[in-house]
C-alpha cells in the first residue's frame, strides 16, 4: 500500500507526464513483451487519490488495441514484460475523462493502478472458439460498444459493435454450422441487437448509407424488427425513395402496437406516411 503513492518521485514519464510508470518487480532480461493485437491477462487494481478502490480484477483478459479497456491500461501493458509488476499513474485523459464513470469515478479523476502482466498470447480466431465462448465475448464487445455510445464516442462504439459481430458467428473454418438450434437462435438475437446498435452509431456519425445497409441486415435476420423498420423507413424517406419508405413505415406501424416502440418515432412515422401518401398521389 505504501507504494500506491500519487506523489511518488521516481516515476518514468511516458507521455508528457499524463502516463507515468514505475516498475516494482522487474522481469528477467529475456522476458518478452506483448504486441499490438495480442490477448493479455493482467492482474489489476485501480484507486482514486483518496485510496478508494474503483477497479479490481485478478484476471483481466483483453486484446490490446480493441478498446476493451481504457487507453491507459493498453498503453502500459504493451510496455510490460511477462511477470513484471508496475505502478501506473494515469491522467483522466487516458481513463474516463470529463465524464468520469458513474457511480464511482468522478470527472477528471486521475487513477493509480498496480498491474501485473500474468500472460499473453496470440488472439484466438472466432471460428476456433466454442459457441458459448463466442457468445460471451461477443456480448462483452457489444456491452463495451454501449458504454462508448452512452459517452457519445460513436466511432469507438461502432468499432466495438463490428468486433462483436465478427465474434457472433456459428460457422467453422470450412463454412459449416457448428451450433445447436438454441445456440443458433441466441447468436442471431445478439447479432440483431448489435446491428441495431451499429445502425444507431452510424447515424450519429453521419453515415446514412451505411446505416440503411445495416438496417437491411437486421431485417434479413428479423423481418419484423420494428426498430429497424422505422429506421429504414425514415432513411428511405430522407433519400427520396418515398414509395418504399411508405410501405416500410406502414409495416412498422402495423406491428408497433405489440412492441415497446412508442412516442416520437411513432408520431414521426404516422405523419410521414400521410405526407408520403399525399406526395405519391400527386404524381399520378
Labelled PLM ranges:
Residues 1-221, 227-255, 261-284:
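Cross-family detector of peptidyl-prolyl cis-trans isomerase
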